[in-house]
Amino acid sequence: MLFLLSLKRIFIFRNHKFNIVGDVMGIEEEIRRIEEELKKTPYNKATQKHIGRLKAKLAKLREQAQSRGGGGGGKGYAVKKSGDATAAFVGFPSVGKSTLLNKLTNAKSEVGAYAFTTLTIVPGILEYKGAKIQLLDAPGIIVGASSGKGRGTEVLSAVRSADLILLTVDIYTLDHLPVLEKELYNVGIRLDQTPPDVKIKVKERGGINVSSTVPLTHIDEDTIEAILNEYRIHNADVVIREDITLEQFIDVVAGNRVYIPSLVVVNKIDLADEEYLKYIKQKLEEFGKDYILVSGNKGINLDLLKEKIYEKLGFIKIYLKPQGKKPDFDEPLIMRRGATVKDVCEKLHKDFVRNFRYAQVWGKSAKHPGQRVGLDHKLEDGDILTIVIKR
C-alpha cells in the first residue's frame, strides 16, 4: 500500500513538472509567433494600435515565461547588498569577469580556461576614494538567458538590484553586446534610461482619459487605450509629460522595470595590435555606450576602471558636523547623487528618521550657511550636515 502511495506521489509530481514545462513551451511558442507577426507588420498610423496591443501581449508573456521557467530547485543567486553601492559584471562565459573581480577586490572567484567556471554569484568589495563598492561576478549567461536557459533568469534577476551594470566582453566578442542588452531588456532592465514621466491613476468608472503636456509623436490615444485594455485597465486618468514611445508606455503600465546605468568593459586588450584596437574603438562608438578597454591579466587600465565605476555610480561626500562641534573632514559619509537628509538619517541609524527634529546645511545645496532644512532636502557633494534629533 505504501509503495503504491509513493508511486502515486511520484506520478503527480512528475505530471505537475511536465505541465509546467508544457506551459513554458506553450508560452515560448506564443512569444515566437508574436515576434514573427511584429517583424512582418509595417509600423504606420494604421497599424500602430495593433502593434501596441501585440507588444503589450509580448511583454506579459515574457513575464510569465520568466516566472514559470525561472528554474526551481538548486542553489539560488540572491546576494545580500553591502557597501555604498553595487556594480555587477554581466557577460557571456570566459570573457574574464572573474579575473577582473579578483584584481579589483579581495574576492576569490574561480578562474579557468574554459566556460562556466563561475557557478554562483561571487561578491567582493572595491574600496576607492572612501567608498566601499560591492562588485558581483555573475555566472556567464547565454543566448536565451532571459527565457530561463542556463538558469539565466535567476542570474539576470539577481543583477536587477545592482546600481551599475558592467557589460563585459573581450576583444573577440564585441558582437555579444547587443545580445546582452536584449537579454537584460527582456527581464525588465532598462540600461541608461530614466523612468518615463507618466502617471496612471486607475479609477472605478469614466473610461480612459489621456492628457499630455507635450505633443506625442510616437503614440496616440487609441494605442494608449489598447495597451491599457490588454492589461485589463479600462478606467484610468493618464498624464504624460514627455514624448514617450510605445515601448516606454508599456514599461510604465507593467510597472516592474528597473533603470540602471551601464559601462562597457572590453577585456584582454593586451592581445590586440594597434590596427585591431582602432577597429574595436570604431565598433564601440557605433554601439553608443560609454566604454573602457582593459586587461585583467596584465593589469592594464584597472585604475581607470575603478575611477569610471566611481564616476558612474555618482557618489557624493557629505561631512557630518555634530551640534556645537567642528565638521569631521577625515571620514566623509559616502552617498549617491540625489540623496536627501532622510537618506543620510536612514544610513546612520534606524531611529534617526523617527526622532528627527531638523537639520542644518552648509555648502552648495544651502541657500545660506547653516540653513535649517527638513528630511526632503537634497544634498550636494561637499555639503556639511548637522542632524538634530529629539532626546
UniProtKB/Swiss-Prot annotation:
- In this chain the OBG-type G domain maps to 85-314
Sequence ranges assigned to domain TGS in this UniProt record: 314-389
Sorted alphabetically, which keywords does the UniProt record give? Answer: GTP-binding, Nucleotide-binding
Tell me the GO molecular function terms: GTP binding; GTPase activity
Say if the entry is tagged with keyword Nucleotide-binding. yes
Q: Does the keyword Transferase apply?
A: no
- GO biological process annotations for this chain's record? cytoplasmic translation
- Which residues of the sequence carry a binding annotation for GTP? 91-98, 137-141, 267-270
Q: Per the record, GO CC terms? A: cytoplasm
Please report which protein family the annotation says this sequence is part of. Answer: Belongs to the TRAFAC class OBG-HflX-like GTPase superfamily. OBG GTPase family.
Q: What is this protein called?
A: Uncharacterized GTP-binding protein MJ1326
